[in-house]
């Protein structure tokens, strides 16, 4: 209501609801709101849209990692007897290769990703009980093959201090009178610092918010509504000469 905003709201199922609320407030107050800006949702969303538009007959796949899942790490930390933890989401390489082959496999959650947990337990804690709570936790670990390692606090700080992440968005499709030609569109990210990369995306979209507001636009927008030129620091002439 008071400012132009750019956010990284990332609960996919609630984005339509969030959009409606921000759109109403922004239009009533004469501001711009750019929501769900980051890499997923965000950069991955854009690549899904482009790939679906180009290959309407096809199949989408998203793989996350290898990287630290902050939400899953927090879920482990809430278990009694856990002092600290890091959880890595890891794509299953054989699943990735099957998708890249263009065979359009049907993959379950368990077949696409594994989860690896590094846990620092409180002194005297029941390690078996902690491990059982982790691997059976609904919505987080129960649907995955999950490995739990108990390590020292020193090892955690030495080997798992960063917040890397990344992933792959892949669409496979066919063209031709008899669907005889297969195509694979793949976009990938490998990030040493998830927060730093996400903030870089937010900064680019802040430029767009500024430009849109200068044009007199109001209301809520997503990455789907923003032309690429609005993100760049350079003007259109530079982009056409050097990047087109």
Residue ranges and their predicted role:
Residues 1-8:
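Rossmann-fold NAD(P) dinucleotide-binding segment
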Residues 9-33:
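Rossmann-fold NAD(P)-binding glycine/threonine-rich loop
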Residues 11-16, 36-45, 66-70, 123, ...:
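Gly/Ser/Thr-rich loops at beta-strand to alpha-helix junctions
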Residues 20, 43-59, 74-84, 208:
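Oxidoreductase and adenylate-handling cofactor-binding alpha/beta cores
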Residues 27-52, 202:
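Short alpha-helices
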Residues 52-54, 59-63, 116-121:
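Short beta-strand and adjoining strand-loop segment in the mid-core
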Residues 69-206:
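C-terminal substrate-binding/catalytic lobe of Rossmann-fold NAD(P)-dependent oxidoreductases
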Residues 183-244:
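NAD(P)-dependent Rossmann-like dehydrogenase/reductase catalytic/cofactor-binding core
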